[in-house]
């Protein structure tokens, strides 16, 4: 019998209802007023400054709930349950018509998003396959193809609810299409382990 294997898959974690409704509402109320940095690509997208868990009791509570998920994600990526910490957090407010262009997150191993409001189905986060080098590209792409995990060049996060968390390797390219719904609010963050050990070649990280 023929078998097909997905070699070296990329982990992506979705953790429903990681933050409870009370905490979600508190984050929305407190940080909506602090988002004043306008996105370079969209006037309808505002961000807070980079924040740290210690900046607010709400962030401390959120980080306490998120960190065990980071440990689980790290075990998939590095094969060991390491000590993880959140480096920075920020809140994003996207009004109707706003968008976030394709990007990834530097100086980080795992990035995450907590959805704080209901999302329009067409405004879920989209992840893109890296384009590779500058060599010639050949594609078979038209109306009659059937997308599979092996030929697709993008993937959209399934419908989310307030309090849901997603985690992904920080190098993954992602974007948000034009928001067709009401105000879209998310909490984003970057995380690192305390260190890595490759047969005695150790490196330590600090927040």
Which stretches of residues belong to each language-model region?
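Non-heme Fe(II)/2-oxoglutarate
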Residues: 1-81, 92, 204-207
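Short conserved micro-motifs at the rims of enzyme active sites and ligand-binding pockets
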Residues: 26, 179, 198-201
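Helix-adjacent hinge/juxtasegments
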Residues: 76-87, 91-92, 98-105, 109
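A structural signal for short, well-ordered beta-strand segments
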Residues: 89-91, 112-114, 187-191
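Catalytic core of non-heme Fe(II) oxygenases with the double-stranded beta-helix
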Residues: 95-165, 193-205
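Short beta-strand His + acidic residue motifs that chelate non-heme Fe in jelly-roll/DSBH
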Residues: 100-103, 174-180
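Short, compositionally biased
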Residues: 179-189
């Amino acid at each position: 019998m023929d078998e097909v294997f997905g070699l070296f898959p990329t982990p992506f974690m979705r953790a429903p209802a990681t933050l409870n409704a009370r905490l979600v509402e508190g984050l929305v109320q407190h940080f909506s007023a602090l988002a004043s940095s306008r996105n370079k690509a969209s006037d309808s997208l505002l961000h807070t400054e980079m924040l740290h868990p210690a900046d607010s009791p709400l962030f401390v509570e959120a980080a306490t709930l998120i960190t065990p998920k980071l440990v689980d994600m790290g075990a998939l990526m590095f094969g060991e349950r390491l000590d993880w910490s959140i480096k920075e957090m920020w809140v994003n407010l996207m009004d109707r018509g706003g968008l976030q262009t394709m990007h990834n997150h530097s100086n980080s191993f795992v990035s995450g998003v907590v959805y704080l409001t209901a999302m329009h189905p067409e405004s879920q986060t989209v992840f893109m396959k890296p384009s590779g080098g500058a060599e010639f590209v050949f594609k078979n792409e038209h109306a009659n193809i059937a997308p599979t995990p092996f030929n697709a060049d993008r993937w959209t996060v399934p419908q989310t609810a307030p309090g849901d968390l997603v985690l992904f390797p920080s190098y993954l390219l992602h974007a948000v299409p034009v928001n067709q719904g009401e105000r879209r609010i998310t909490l984003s963050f970057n995380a690192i382990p305390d260190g890595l050990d490759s047969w005695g070649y150790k490196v330590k990280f600090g927040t």
